[in-house]
Regions:
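Patatin-like phospholipase
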Residues: 2, 28-84, 92-399, 403-410, ...
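Bacterial N-terminal signal peptides that target proteins for export
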Residues: 2-20
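Solvent-exposed coil/turn segments that connect beta secondary-structure elements
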Residues: 99, 108, 190-193, 203-205, ...
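Outer-membrane beta-barrel and related beta-rich outer-membrane complex signature
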Residues: 266, 510-516, 561-569, 653-666, ...
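Gram-negative/organellar outer-membrane beta-barrel architecture
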Residues: 391-397, 409-588, 669-681, 686-690, ...
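C-terminal outer-membrane beta-barrel translocator/porin domains of Gram-negative envelope proteins
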Residues: 403, 409, 422-424, 436-446, ...
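Outer-membrane beta-barrel channels and translocator barrels
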Residues: 407, 432, 464-466, 493-495, ...
Length: 777
């Protein structure tokens, strides 16, 4: 019998040692797999590992959903996902366990445009914020701190997007390793401080997706693990190498980047900036494309006519993604599995390690970074220790917090450590200041030499004290009017919204006085003008009506005067003649209901403003007024109808006469004015003055369904029919003929506010061509 050779014995010894090592390590390996999923679940060790790379591109990212739908139909397994920007959002949601059809259905049920651009449902805002967007439609807010003015780091804070992503990934704790997801996932972001690429592979999945798509200048940067991050497209918009580093054998890369525009299409600084970003991103995309190998697959859906912000065209993007896969089906077929093998793959990639249903919150940690006390944040949270974690319920609480206007962002994270689930609420105040300035512009002209211009400036200083005291100032400087209003608002019971507001204000208004032709004609001219001054100081008690509006009740002391500036009767040389002076203590009730969906071009909702003021005490001339105006809007498709009504009058005083050159004031009341755009549009501003007023308007708006028209965003074509009149005597109120006017116009939002251009006509040959900047109701 031959004896084994020495080399054979060495082989047997090594083989035995290897088996012993396997037996020793096997329990540890089994324990490790139960603690965390391996990078690639072992459904079929013989097939190549496939990585999916999804690029950024905003709304064009809907194409990724179409790609995923087709890959599922072809039974192509995905073992790892690397994504950037919108690709990180779609990829992260898919990796978390949302299949393509479920993802498409979820996105179809939300308005991603409103969510991505942080458009809040206006009806749910506090009344103070609704007041501001009425007065300052530009929407620009500058902060002031440390002796300098600052602007927000982004036009959009991204709070609604983050909340949505958190709700859709709520089954995963916020300190998870992304390798534990059903499909291992990585997102790419850019460190704003260094310019380096950052791979996000652990922590909050929602936060990682939000950070990856923080387009500089548009979305505010976001802090993750102490680093300020922005969109990953700046460094790697198509992260092929990242997928390769995750251990895949084959890459399916989907590039949805925007195409370069022709030079003649670059008609604005914003367009040039976008072109520059597209060029820079395109350079890193080309570098990543160069890393693709022969067996890799590159998909580039045809997305002509679909821009970064065209979220409304999502279905078009989905179809483009499906078509791109269909065109590459021959190559992808080699990667597909049998039905049985694909079912095993899906089973292996079911969510494991997610939060169990009914997970209870063991502790709540709230942090703030400014003057708003932690107790205020806790007060507005409905969740308590011991409650079952409900991401959507908590998002509703955080949404209510963010709409207060005090915070830049309010985020939630549920982290698990040693079996203890801690809910962390981070409320960050606005980083661009502790005082804020608001801006607005107004202008009107009918191209005949008459016109007016004004600048609006607002100042807000919230949380002067821990009790929530706010200082509010509003200034109007214009050719025909000037005013200043200063007010302190002190909350009494913050949980109920009550407040007390001492205030002081001064207003000066100049209006032309017209010859009282009945009916008025095109030749009706102003023969003098009137300057009205009002000074008032008082204190109001404010009470909210839920989120529908508020009531203010108060007392004040008011002083009024009117001065005539005669022109025509003095050969054109103005002669000022004080005519009317009065002062009195008064009580006032002010009701505001505001449920319009938009303050400028409402498509739905209603608005009501009612003001009643009456004098008291021993005064020579007591003046009492009541005024109300309302607007109701409704829409069907692209068609919108608005109905506006207004009424005003004096009560409890002697009926005024018309002895003052056409001015209706009785020595105390300045009367009410009618005329001007959308206030009898064919006539001059404030052409009609009386002690009593009635007015109504029906307006039709047609959405032109284009993104931009002559610099106007969301332009509309409009037509209006108007009727109204003023009366001097109470007994004549509502009687006689009504003045009528009709108009046709084009309007839309411009960078400096709402803009209208149109034509108006009335009987007796009266007509106007007008250009109006600023709010009209």
């Amino acid at each position: 019998m031959a004896f084994p050779t020495a080399s054979f014995l060495r082989y047997r010894v090594r083989q035995l040692a290897a088996w012993l090592l396997v037996l020793i390590c096997l329990p540890r390996l089994a324990h490790g797999q139960s603690a965390a999923s391996p990078p690639f679940p072992q459904d079929d060790v013989r097939r190549p590992r496939i990585g999916l790379v999804l690029s950024g591109g905003g709304a064009r990212g809907y194409a990724h959903i179409g790609v995923l739908k087709m890959l599922e139909r072809l039974h192509v397994p995905i073992d790892a996902i690397a994504g950037t920007s919108m690709g990180a959002v779609v990829g992260g949601l898919y990796a978390s366990g949302l299949h393509a059809d479920a993802l498409e259905q979820k996105l179809s049920q939300v308005d991603l445009s409103d969510i991505a651009f942080d458009r809040k449902e206006r009806a749910k805002l506090p009344q103070s914020l609704r007041e501001d967007d009425f007065q300052y439609p530009i929407g620009l807010s500058a902060g002031y701190a440390d002796g300098e003015l600052k602007l927000p780091a982004g036009l959009v804070q991204g709070n609604r997007l983050l909340a949505l992503l958190k709700a859709w990934t709520a089954q995963w704790p916020d300190n998870i390793d992304f390798a534990r997801l059903p499909i291992p996932f990585r997102a790419v972001a850019t460190d704003l401080a260094t310019g380096d690429g950052v791979v996000l592979d652990h922590g909050s999945l929602a936060l990682a997706m939000r950070a990856s798509m923080a387009v500089p200048g548009l979305f505010a940067p976001i802090e993750v693990d102490g680093r300020t991050l922005v969109d990953g497209g700046l460094v790697s918009n198509l992260p092929v190498q990242l997928a390769r580093d995750m251990g895949v054998d084959i890459v399916i890369a989907v590039n949805i980047g925007s195409d370069l525009q022709r030079p003649e299409a670059l008609a604005s600084p914003a367009a040039v900036t976008q072109q520059m970003i597209t060029i820079l991103v395109g350079q890193n995309v080309r570098a990543q494309k160069a890393l693709l190998r022969r067996n890799d697959v590159l998909l580039e859906p045809r997305l002509t006519g679909l821009s970064f912000a065209d979220f409304a065209k999502g279905p078009q993007g989905v179809r483009a993604g499906e078509e791109a896969v269909s065109e590459a089906q021959a190559r992808l077929a080699a990667l597909s599995l049998s039905a049985q093998a694909y079912a095993a793959y899906r089973e292996a990639h079911r969510p494991r390690g997610a939060l169990a249903g009914g997970t209870r919150i063991d502790a709540i940690e709230v942090t703030t970074n400014g003057r708003v006390p932690v107790a205020r944040v806790r007060q507005l949270l409905s969740v308590r220790e011991g409650d079952v974690y409900d991401a959507e319920r908590l998002n509703r609480d955080l949404s209510a917090l963010s709409t207060l206007g005090d915070f830049e962002s309010v985020t939630q994270q549920l982290v698990e450590h040693d079996g203890v689930h801690t809910l962390r609420i981070d409320a960050r105040e606005k980083s661009w200041g502790n005082q804020f300035f608001l801006f607005g512009l107004g202008m009107s002209t009918n191209f005949d030499g008459r016109g007016a211009f004004n600048v609006n400036l607002g100042h807000r200083y919230p949380w002067l004290t821990q009790g929530g005291l706010e200082w509010r100032n509003d200034i109007v400087l214009g050719s025909n009017r000037a005013s200043i209003h200063t007010e302190l608002r002190q909350p009494l019971w913050q949980s109920m919204g009550y407040y007390v507001a001492p205030y002081a204000e001064y207003a000066r208004r100049r209006s032309d006085i017209y010859i009282d032709d009945l009916p008025p004609t095109k030749d009706t001219k102003a023969f003098n003008n009137l300057t009205i001054e009002t000074a008032r100081a008082g204190v109001d008690f404010g009470m909210p009506l839920g989120r529908k509006g508020e009531v203010r009740l108060g007392v004040n002391y008011v002083r009024r005067s009117a001065t005539f500036n005669y022109l025509a009767l003095t050969g054109g040389v103005p002669v000022a003649q004080p005519m009317l002076r009065a002062q009195q203590p008064a009580v006032r009730a002010l009701l505001t209901l505001d449920q319009l969906d938009d303050p400028l071009f409402p498509r739905g909702g209603y608005y009501l403003l009612a003001n009643v003021e009456g004098g008291f005490g021993s005064v020579d001339k007591r003046f009492n007024t009541a005024q109300a105006k309302g607007l109701w809007a409704t829409s069907v498709g692209r068609h919108t109808f608005n109905v506006a009504l207004e009424g005003a009058g004096q009560f409890g005083a002697n009926s005024p006469t018309k002895a003052n050159g056409g001015y209706s004031g009785d020595g105390a009341n300045e009367g009410f004015f009618l005329g001007g755009f959308q206030h009898l549009s064919a006539y001059a501003p404030d052409q009609f003055n009386g002690s009593y007023l009635l007015y109504g308007r029906l307006t039709y708006l047609y959405d032109l369904h284009v993104t931009d028209l002559l610099g106007l965003r969301a332009p509309v074509f409009g037509a209006s029919a108007e009727a109204g009149n003023v009366w001097q005597l109470r007994d004549n109120f509502g009687r006689g003929a009504y003045l009528k006017s009709g108009s046709l116009f084009v309007g839309g939002n411009s960078p400096i506010g709402p803009l209208y251009f149109g034509f108006a006509a009335a009987p007796q040959g009266v007509w106007n061509v007008y250009l109006q900047l600023g709010r009209v109701f």
